């Protein structure tokens, strides 16, 4: 069943891509807005950027963890051109009641943007479950689910143009950067993985990526085969440290197969797990990578920007760290070096 589903998805995306090519144009992913303006430098082959995620406070707090402020200030020493963020920028769904435009949610976004300004460079976010979901309680269970009103609020606060979905892409230098929305509201008929259960019997949503987004993503990858590097950033991981945190399995399998087709997809960066995990390697620090590569992309989980930390599984001691951190990417032509920068223990979360 899994193989048939995966084959069907890839076939539909391939047919859509071929049809677009025959018409002389590929459908484009929309431009993803940042916290500031980024001017592309098409000739640039040497630049640095930062990646991180999961800074959201505990409970329904407005105040951001000190870890976030430290990361945004400390990373300046690497002189990044911009920052990629893999979601959960606010406490979000724990604060969402019947009125999704509650002043607490607005205040949470305002505080995040105030902190983001400390970076001095634009930040680009792929949404997480805390921005997009609500909690529904019944006698039997408490379930987290995506919500249209939360999505609308996210689009408004993140200043997306009207009628634009919360995903997209942008170019810088020799590279393409793609933000995937793993938190789409699924149709009622969608069959999805079982979400993991956390504290107080809250069942988390496993995420969802629509066929429409998958088709646009496939077409965008095809249209950008000439780019030296493609970096993908998203919230739910395709290859997490713990299987219970994985993106909805059918979506994860389809995306992994799609990314493997394009040898210039260099890195896939996710969060959701509050830790660091090098899913592709056997060490904390990722190895240097050249593009194109038939080995497929390097998969990294970077969710240590301030949210309460998760523990690493016992079998991942060599390539997992339950630590606050951020990633530094240095692009030099066809080569990329990544450095994991740990936040000193003296920097307190609160």
Say what each PLM segment does.
Residues 85-86, 90-93, 224-242:
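Short acidic, glycine-rich surface-loop motifs adjacent to enzyme active sites
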Residues 1-4:
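Positively charged n-region of N-terminal signal peptides that target proteins for export
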Residues 54, 87-88, 128-129, 235, ...:
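Active-site glycine-centered loops adjacent to acidic/histidine catalytic or metal-binding residues
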Residues 7-16:
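Bacterial N-terminal signal peptides
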Residues 339-349:
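Short, solvent-exposed aromatic-acidic interface loops
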Residues 17-21:
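Sec/Tat signal peptide C-region and signal peptidase I cleavage site
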């Amino acid at each position: 069943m899994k193989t048939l589903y995966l084959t069907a998805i890839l076939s539909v995306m391939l047919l859509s891509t071929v049809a677009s090519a025959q018409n002389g144009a590929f459908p484009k992913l929309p431009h993803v807005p940042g916290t500031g303006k980024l001017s592309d430098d098409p000739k640039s082959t040497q630049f640095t950027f930062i990646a991180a995620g999961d800074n959201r406070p505990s409970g329904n707090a407005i105040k951001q963890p000190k870890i976030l402020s430290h990361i945004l200030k400390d990373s300046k020493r690497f002189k990044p051109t911009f920052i990629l963020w893999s979601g959960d920028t606010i406490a979000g769904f724990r604060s969402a009641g019947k009125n999704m435009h509650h002043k607490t949610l607005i205040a949470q976004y305002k505080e995040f943007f105030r902190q983001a300004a400390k970076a001095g460079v634009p930040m680009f976010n792929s949404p997480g479950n805390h921005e997009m979901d609500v909690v529904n309680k019944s006698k039997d269970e408490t379930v987290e689910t995506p919500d249209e009103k939360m999505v609308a609020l996210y689009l408004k606060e993140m200043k997306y143009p009207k009628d634009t979905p919360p995903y997209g892409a942008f170019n810088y230098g020799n590279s393409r950067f793609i933000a995937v929305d793993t938190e789409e509201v699924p149709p009622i008929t969608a069959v999805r993985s079982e979400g993991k259960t956390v504290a107080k019997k809250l069942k988390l949503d496993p995420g969802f990526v629509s066929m429409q987004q998958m088709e646009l993503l496939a077409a965008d990858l095809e249209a950008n085969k000439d780019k030296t590097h493609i970096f993908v950033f998203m919230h739910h991981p395709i290859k997490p440290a713990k299987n219970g945190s994985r993106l909805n399995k059918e979506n994860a399998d389809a995306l992994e197969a799609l990314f493997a087709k394009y040898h210039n997809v260099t890195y896939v960066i996710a969060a959701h797990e509050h830790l660091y995990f090098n899913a592709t390697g056997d060490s904390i620090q990722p190895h240097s990578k050249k593009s194109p590569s038939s080995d497929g992309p390097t998969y990294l989980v970077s969710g240590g920007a301030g949210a309460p930390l998760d523990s690493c599984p016992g079998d991942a001691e060599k390539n997992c760290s339950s630590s606050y951190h951020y990633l530094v990417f240095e692009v030099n032509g066809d080569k990329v070096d990544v450095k994991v920068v740990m936040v000193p223990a003296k920097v307190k979360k609160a």
